[in-house]
Amino acid sequence: MRSTNVTDPFAGFKAAQRHGWSTFAPLENQTTPPAARLVNHAGIRAGQRVLDVACGTAVVAVTAARRGASVTALDLTPELLARARENAGIAGVTVDFHEGDVEQLPFEASTFDVVVSQFGHIFAPRPDVAIAEMLRVLKPGGTIAFSTWPPELCLGRIFALSARFGPPLPPGVPPPVLWGDPNVVRERLGSAVKNLVFDRGTMAVPTLSPAHHRDVTERTAGPMRKIVEVLSASDPARLTEFRTEYEAVISEYLKDNEVRQDYLLTRATKI
């Protein structure tokens, strides 16, 4: 294992993220179908060593392990790792779990055949550091693959809305949804990879109404929880405005009791 005793200028920000995402587990039913799509996109097969970065409740890790891969999974949030271990146990698969940070991966260079992340690594405050770490632990010729939210579509627009109403990101931290722009992804991966491929997928989220979608998200997703916490105490009228705009966005993507949340899939080979 590699030492990660490095001073982190974003330690406070990451501590807030750790707390904010601690209630995410109920959303795993939404992220489970896209997990299989990412595993397919990455071409994961039996016998490969796979790292799932920012694994959450391990829907990707367990899916890969059920296909015979040797899986390691890492997340910043202990509460999500507790549920991740439960999921692996229920599925009857072995996953090597670690509490840790994508910007300081505790693994030696060139360890894994495949490195994946589903809607997780995008929250790292320094994209250049995160992607460098993901590529560092990947073997030459190995596959890096991830799922992200395009800024112009449903969840990207919700993130932009949240940025308007919520606390600002620390100086120098870019919006997570930039990872959903193929041009940005291409630039961030740069000359370290070849065979860069993009695809699209859709997360169909069952919901009775835009208000139901908002209610669930407010109770589970870190950025939304923070907005409600701050505005309910300081500016209830602005909270009402936020909720109205949120439901208006969701209504554009709601049909037949499903919210269509499209995402970007990326795959590349490390040179």
What are these regions (language model features)?
Residues 10, 28-31, 178-271:
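Conserved Class I S-adenosyl-L-methionine
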Residues 113-127:
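A short SAM/SAH-binding and catalytic strip from SAM-dependent methyltransferases
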Residues 27-28, 128-129, 135, 139-209:
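Conserved catalytic/acceptor-binding region of the Class I
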Residues 2-48, 59, 83, 87-90:
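Conserved class I S-adenosyl-L-methionine
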Residues 49-105, 129:
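Class I SAM-dependent methyltransferase SAM/SAH-binding core
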